[in-house]
C-alpha cells in the first residue's frame, strides 16, 4: 500500500494523494509514465504554469476535510478566484494521448477531492475543476476541465473516504487478530519457562 496512514485513538489521518492512489486505483497503478519528467523538472514545470497565471492566482493552498473518523489533508496546486477554477497541475513529456487511463483517473480523483475541500473551505456552491498538463519539452499546456457542483464533489469525496476507511479498519482488525494469536501461542512458552525456573531453584539430591 503506497501511502502513509497515521492513526491515533480517535481518528485516521491521510494525505489527499495517498487517499486517491488507494481509492481510485483500477488495475495495476504503475505510476511510471515513460518517458516522464524528473522530480526537478516537475517542480520547475509547476512554477512555470503558476507564473503565467493572472494576478490574484493562489498556489499551494493548504486544505483539509473530515469524513467520520478520517481526516484528509493536502495542498492544492492552484486556484483562480476570477473564474472559480481549481487546478491540479501535472507535467509530462511527449504525447499526452499515450498516458495510461488509470493515471488520468488518479489525477481526476485528486482534483475532485481538492475541489470539494475548496468548496467546503470557501463555501462555494460549485467550482470548475481542471487538470493542467505541461509538456516540459515543448512548454505546451493542455487544460481539461469539468464544472462540478459542491454536492457532486462531496459525494465523490465521501465515496473515496468510505473505501479507504473500510480498508484501514479491516487492516487494523487483522493486525489485532494476529496479535491475539501470537499472544495465545506465547502463553505455553511462558508457562514452560516458569516451570523450568521453579525446577532450577530446587536443591540437588545426591545419590
Where are these regions (language model features)?
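Metal-dependent nuclease catalytic cores that hydrolyze phosphodiester bonds in DNA/RNA
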Residues: 1-84, 109
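Mg2+/Mn2+-dependent nuclease catalytic core
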Residues: 64-156
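ATP-dependent helicase/translocase motor core
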Residues: 124-207
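Short acidic (Asp/Glu) and glycine-rich catalytic loops that position anionic groups and cofactors
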Residues: 23-29, 91-93, 137, 180
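Short coil/turn segments at secondary-structure junctions
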Residues: 33, 98-99, 188
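Hydrophobic, Leu/Ile/Phe/Ala-enriched alpha-helical segments that form helix-helix packing faces
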Residues: 49-53, 115-122, 204
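Short, well-ordered alpha-helical scaffold segments within catalytic/effector domains
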Residues: 46-47, 108, 112-114, 194-205
Amino acid at each position: 500500500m503506497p501511502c502513509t496512514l497515521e492513526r491515533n485513538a480517535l481518528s485516521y489521518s491521510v494525505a489527499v494523494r495517498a487517499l486517491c492512489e488507494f481509492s481510485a486505483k483500477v488495475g495495476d497503478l504503475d505510476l511510471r509514465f515513460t518517458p516522464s519528467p524528473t522530480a526537478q523538472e516537475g517542480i520547475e514545470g509547476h512554477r512555470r504554469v503558476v507564473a503565467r497565471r493572472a494576478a490574484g492566482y493562489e498556489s499551494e493552498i493548504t486544505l483539509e476535510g473530515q469524513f467520520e473518523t478520517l481526516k484528509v489533508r493536502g495542498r492544492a496546486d492552484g486556484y483562480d478566484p476570477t473564474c472559480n477554477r481549481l487546478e491540479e497541475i501535472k507535467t509530462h513529456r511527449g504525447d499526452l494521448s499515450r498516458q495510461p487511463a488509470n493515471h488520468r483517473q488518479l489525477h481526476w480523483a485528486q482534483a475532485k477531492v481538492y475541489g470539494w475541500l475548496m468548496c467546503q473551505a470557501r463555501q462555494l456552491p460549485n467550482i470548475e475543476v481542471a487538470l493542467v498538463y505541461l509538456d516540459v519539452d515543448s512548454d505546451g499546456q493542455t487544460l481539461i476541465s469539468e464544472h462540478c457542483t459542491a454536492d457532486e464533489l462531496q459525494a465523490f469525496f465521501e465515496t473515496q473516504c468510505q473505501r479507504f476507511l473500510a480498508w484501514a479498519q479491516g487492516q487494523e482488525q487483522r493486525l489485532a487478530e494476529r496479535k491475539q494469536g501470537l499472544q495465545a501461542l506465547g502463553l505455553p512458552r511462558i508457562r514452560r519457562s516458569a516451570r523450568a525456573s521453579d525446577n532450577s531453584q530446587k536443591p540437588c539430591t545426591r545419590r
